[in-house]
């Protein structure tokens, strides 16, 4: 987490596993240890950073104090704190919601009040097995301070507002499809989440995300073809028209040239957040050609983060 903050990332992610009342952090069940809890790796460090950023002024009294975020040079910039539910959503939710209480009590969580978004230093977004009906429920989310990671692949909107997306996978021989790990891909059959893209609004969702490899398909000869580009544009367009932040995960990570090519194309097409696990590679890129994208807030979401 600290390396992500130091690099200027405005999004961090924790994979959580619920066992009893405890929430453990790790990429797989075999990586879990007793001290690697959500509280130890994320809640307490975030609370400590934000408390230090919000010490009352000692010289001149601020008559209109506002909460400062994590970044000293950009105090109004919120940090997205994505929580990826790895265990069953409805039983994981209570422990997760309770774990946020110290941050909630300090007023650090962005929330919805009377139909209006109240911006605060942190934006909590549930993904993975997070149940959408809990996010939208006043019973389960009474403070309305946990948002959803909406399905970007449902958001396609063409330039002429058509909603029927082109099928990128149909443009290549079946023999070119490569086997891939699908264990982290959640389908609508697994969770009773809405298939109507208009169900996801800024009042219940923040990101709209999808697997790049699943939604866009194989990159033949390392190139994004025109149909795939139209899919990317349409999904980004549809998310942004609905007030959500477009994000692709599971982008190619090797070879480096292909990874950089995909990053460039996504930024060029207006993606809101770039999903990275190579912080050094992302921060060393020259983003000046892309409309000041990097300097507009460093919209990088770090994945594969174990908290430190």
Question: Where in this protein do the model-derived segments appear?
Answer:
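General structural concept
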Residues: 1-16, 22
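Catalytic cores of phosphodiester-bond hydrolases, prominently lipid phosphodiesterases
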Residues: 6, 21-308
């Amino acid at each position: 987490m600290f390396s992500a903050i130091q690099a200027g990332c405005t999004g961090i992610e924790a994979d959580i596993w619920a066992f009893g009342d405890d929430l453990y952090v790790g990429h797989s069940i075999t990586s879990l240890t007793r001290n690697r809890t959500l509280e130890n790796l994320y809640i307490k460090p975030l609370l400590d950073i934000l408390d230090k950023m919000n010490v009352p002024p000692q010289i001149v009294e601020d008559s209109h104090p506002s909460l400062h975020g994590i970044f000293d040079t950009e105090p109004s910039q919120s940090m997205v704190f994505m929580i990826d539910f790895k265990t069953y959503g409805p039983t994981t939710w209570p422990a997760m919601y309770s774990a946020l209480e110290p941050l909630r009590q300090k007023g650090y969580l962005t929330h919805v009040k009377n139909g209006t978004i109240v911006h605060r230093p942190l934006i909590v977004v549930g993904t993975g097995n997070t149940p959408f009906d809990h996010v939208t429920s006043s019973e389960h989310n009474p403070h309305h301070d946990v948002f959803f990671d909406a399905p970007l692949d449902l958001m396609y909107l063409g330039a002429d507002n058509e909603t029927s997306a082109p099928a990128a996978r149909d443009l290549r021989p079946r023999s070119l499809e490569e086997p891939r790990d699908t264990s982290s891909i959640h389908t609508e059959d697994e969770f009773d989440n809405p298939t109507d893209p208009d169900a996801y609004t800024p009042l219940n969702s923040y990101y709209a995300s999808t697997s790049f490899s699943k939604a866009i398909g194989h990159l033949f000869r390392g190139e994004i073809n025109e149909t795939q580009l139209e899919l990317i544009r349409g999904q980004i367009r549809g998310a942004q028209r609905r007030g959500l932040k477009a994000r692709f995960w599971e982008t190619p990570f090797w070879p480096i040239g292909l990874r950089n090519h995909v990053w460039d194309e996504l930024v060029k097409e207006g993606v809101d957040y770039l999903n990275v696990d190579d912080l050094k590679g992302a921060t060393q890129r020259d983003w000046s050609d892309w409309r000041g994208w990097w300097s507009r807030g460093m919209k990088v979401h770090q994945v594969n983060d174990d908290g430190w």
